[in-house]
């Protein structure tokens, strides 16, 4: 199974509607991908224990930034609360709640980041507390199927045509939630198979699939281990 057949296996071989695409590349530059978290600011109170901030990050992996921020504030990483992880190669904006004084946070200076203090609160935030994310994408190098460059106006015309067709087929302002192969396993799409077995209550099959399914880039040792599991289902023989 190669990369193309994996995409077809996962159902990525066709579009939601028929129409001409625009080709092109995403994330050529960091500023080509922008993510703005849509969330409500926790109730503010000057006597609150926590500080609420809005951070804008440029090319930062979220967890790495949170660790860097906690060190700068002199606190444990577990005292910095976020609602979600954002793309690294992007400009991202999101809320954080920090268990540190406003004065301490005002002194923080981390490269490629902006920290806007919103106030104090008694409330923490947890994963997925936000309402959603707003994405702004720049597509560069748009081209036709034969590789011929597309003018910006023609590319936009095609995009608007596809949006109109999707509105007719799916409903107004409804857009398919496209999920790339990486969510399923880009070189070993085992996740949907294991999930199907778990949902069916066949946990033994879920384990067999997880351990035994071949991967596109498995090394010799891993490939032999998976084959041994498929043949014997014996952990001792696989070690």
Locate each region found by the language model.
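Ser/Thr-Pro-rich, acidic low-complexity intrinsically disordered regions of eukaryotic RNA-binding
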Residues: 61-68
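Extended, charged/glycine-rich binding lobes that contact polyanionic ligands
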Residues: 1-44, 50, 58-59, 72-73, ...
């Amino acid at each position: 199974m190669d990369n193309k057949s994996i995409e077809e296996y996962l159902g990525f071989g066709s579009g939601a509607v028929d129409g001409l695409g625009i080709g092109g590349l995403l994330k050529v530059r960091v500023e080509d991908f922008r993510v703005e978290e849509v969330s409500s600011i926790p109730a503010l109170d000057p006597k609150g224990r926590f500080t609420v901030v809005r951070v804008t990050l440029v090319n930062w992996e979220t967890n790495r930034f949170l660790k860097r921020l906690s060190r700068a504030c002199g606190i444990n990483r577990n005292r910095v609360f976020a609602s979600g992880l954002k793309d690294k190669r992007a400009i991202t904006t999101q809320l954080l709640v920090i268990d540190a004084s406003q004065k301490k946070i005002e002194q923080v200076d981390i490269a490629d980041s902006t920290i806007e203090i919103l106030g104090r609160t008694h409330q923490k935030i947890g994963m997925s507390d936000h309402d959603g994310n707003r994405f702004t994408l720049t597509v560069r190098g748009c081209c036709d199927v034969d590789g011929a460059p597309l003018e910006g106006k023609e590319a936009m015309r095609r995009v608007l045509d596809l949006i109109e067709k999707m509105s007719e087929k799916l409903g107004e302002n409804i857009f398919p939630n496209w999920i790339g192969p990486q969510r399923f396993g880009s070189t070993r799409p085992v996740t949907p198979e294991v999930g199907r077995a778990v949902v069916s209550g066949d946990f033994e099959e879920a384990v067999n699939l997880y351990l035994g399914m071949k991967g596109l880039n498995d090394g010799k040792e891993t490939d032999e281990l998976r084959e041994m599991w498929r043949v014997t289902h014996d952990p001792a023989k696989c070690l």
